[in-house]
Regions:
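N-terminal pre-P-loop "Q-motif" helix
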Residues: 1-12, 107
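Phosphate-binding P-loop
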Residues: 14-20
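A short hydrophobic beta-strand->loop->alpha-helix junction that borders the nucleotide-binding pocket
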Residues: 26, 52-61, 161, 178
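Conserved phosphate-binding/catalytic loops and adjacent sensor/switch elements of nucleotide-binding enzymes
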Residues: 36-123, 133
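A conserved switch/coupling segment of P-loop NTPase cores
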Residues: 42-43, 47, 109-179
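Helix-loop-helix "sensor" segment of P-loop NTPases
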Residues: 77-78, 97-99, 155-157, 162-252, ...
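Amphipathic alpha-helical scaffolds
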Residues: 201, 266-270, 277-305
Length: 305
């Protein structure tokens, strides 16, 4: 993993640390959080941990305790070995018995009991990717548990998209920011994965990717395809690509969509008008908006980011 030596070191140390046994990784879409979660899972496996992985699903983000059910799914058979109070708590939380939903504290304590039993023979690492999509009830319970892991044999690491607000923002767990790659690391990654890019496309990708590994890996192939869909002339393709006026892959839409969402209303309005016009910074003063640019059928084809 190019440019992630610091983060990898922190995560490797986290596996054996006696303090801060819960950690939240935060970064924008495509910045490499999942790869870092793979790293900490591998490090934990090599050090003798049992690793349980889960991932938030946006479609289930409105279902109370759905996320917690996924996190604990492989451990649920052991609920039968808990005391009756905790068995009832789990039963009502997961719809196996009637009753009022348990409080965060009641369910959190039951989860701690279950995790304590599960980690009696060997230490346990819980890895949750896309934690921003956990339902609110599960986020509260997992956060409650994460704040009470110190000194035990259980560790928790959660990956979050920094641009999506969630209950994790106030969970009070230690955070490890995952920033964009440095210019040097971005160039190294691009040259390693796309060594045959010509200088102009290389510069274009670096400028638009802004250190985002997903964009660095996927933009070159996309821009190459877009270029071949145009007139076949590099200059013409370059104008289209520089404006990013054609549809980009869905995964990259999340990257650029969140950046656009962070802009002011005025700036977003100017971007929208420029996109609809087909006009950009290269338009000459007094020129007709969109003149000499993409035909209207293409120019006005838009998709939500």
């Amino acid at each position: 993993m190019i440019g992630r030596e610091g983060e990898r070191g922190r995560l490797s140390a986290f596996v054996t640390a006696t303090e801060d046994q819960a950690l939240v990784l935060k970064g924008e879409t495509g910045v490499g959080k999942s790869a870092l979660l793979d790293h900490v899972a591998e490090a934990a496996t090599q050090s003798g941990h049992e690793v349980i992985r889960a991932a938030g699903v946006e479609a289930e983000s409105g279902l109370p305790f759905a996320g917690l059910h996924q996190v604990l799914h492989t451990l649920l058979p052991a609920v039968e070995r808990l005391d009756e109070v905790h068995r009832v708590v789990f039963g009502t939380a997961f719809g196996q018995s009637c009753g009022r939903p348990p409080s965060v504290m009641a369910l959190g304590i039951a989860v701690l009991d279950l995790l304590g039993q599960a980690s009696a023979a060997r230490p346990l690492l819980l890895v949750v990717d896309d934690g921003q999509w956990l339902d609110a009830a599960s986020t509260e319970v997992v956060g409650f548990v994460g704040r009470r892991l110190a000194g035990g044999a259980v560790r928790l690491v959660v990956g979050l998209r920094s641009e999506v607000a969630s209950g994790w923002d106030t969970a009070g767990l230690p955070e490890l920011p995952v920033p964009a790659l440095s210019d040097t690391a971005a160039q190294e990654l691009l040259d390693l994965r796309h060594p045959d890019l010509d200088a102009s496309l290389r510069r274009l990708v670096l400028d638009h990717a802004r250190g985002n590994p997903l964009a660095l890996l996927e933009l070159p192939a996309h821009l190459h395809r877009v270029g071949h869909q145009g007139t076949g002339e590099r200059a013409s393709a370059g104008i289209q690509l520089h404006g990013l006026s054609l549809t980009v892959p869905r995964r990259l839409q999340h990257v650029y969509g969140t950046r656009i969402a962070a802009l002011s209303d005025r700036v977003r309005g100017e971007l929208l008008r420029g996109a609809l016009d087909g006009a950009g910074a290269t338009s000459a003063p007094g020129s007709v908006p969109g003149a000499g640019r993409l035909p209207g059928a293409v120019r006005y084809r838009m998709r939500d980011a």
